[in-house]
Amino acid sequence: MAHNHPPYPCFTVEICRRGLLGEPFRLIDVGVRGGVGEHWLFFGDHLELWGFDPLEEAIEPLRSANKRPGRMHYFTMGLGDKDEARPFRFYPENPPSSHFAASNGCNNDAIDSHWQQVQLRRLDTLFADGTIGPVDFMKMDAETYEVEIIRGAERFLAESGIFGVESETAFFRTPRNPRSHFVELFEELAPLGFDVYDAGIHRAPRAAMARGFPKLEGESYKLRPVGRAWVFDFLFLRGFEQIDASTSIDRLLKIIAVAETYGLQDVGLEILLTHKNRLSKRLDVEQAADWLVRDRTDTKLTYREYLRL
């Protein structure tokens, strides 16, 4: 999905490289097939990951290539609202269409040899038994089962310290989500203080222009995605408006870094300047403001210069 991830999040890189961030950035990736998103790798050795996929063939390559098993953890299991085994259908020709059998039976799935039993666990269970500790952020790409994951995470969401969720979702209605997936997902997250901050869009073009619209750039044409907005990738954040003296400096730094990671440098900069007295105990606030107006390695633009543009 097309979030505006900066090519070089200078603030995030610098607080990690200089040792200004005093604790890990803790991430859950639900649907980690193919590896964690490259934008998270800017946290470097500060990144601690719990990655989940229901199939061993997705997890085994990640485990085999894992050079940081102490902080990068991969699990062959799905997440949901129950601790159980459930049939899972994998489509090798189109992995994003793979899915669990619906728990309420509304999909009328015909379970045959193409399905396999996989383990589901609630986040509350994994949090209670210590498999997962404190968490800052969770990314979910679970092919419409994100609502069930949230419903199985009541204690986790209340006690883990998580302040951000990225989730694939959609507005069309189905028998399993009659009011739409987004409505049901937001109804679970909103009472916990999460608000919408960003959205990426995946478009579904009609067959007549499936390759995209030919946009002239210079002397050649570039194909620009077109089509109805079909699937979305929403960013939900909480606590950004209720920061107080109880919010640790490390948490402030991670909140600013996540805002930058999603191209919300204005949000990060406002937090930095609002809480400059506390943050100045850890870093040079003016220099940090400079980092937040840079997204490339070849610019030396400062915040003061930005204000004069």
Residue ranges: model-predicted function:
Residues 1-3:
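S-adenosyl-L-methionine
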Residues 5-95, 101-113, 171-174:
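SAM cofactor-binding core of SAM-dependent methyltransferases
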Residues 75-79, 117-120, 139:
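Conserved residues in the N-terminal Rossmann fold of short-chain dehydrogenase/reductase
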Residues 96-98, 103-109, 118-130:
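Switch- and interface-adjacent substructures of P-loop NTPase systems
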Residues 110-116, 225-229:
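A recurrent flexible, glycine/aromatic-enriched loop bordering the glycosyltransferase active site
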Residues 248-309:
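C-terminal accessory extensions appended to soluble enzyme cores
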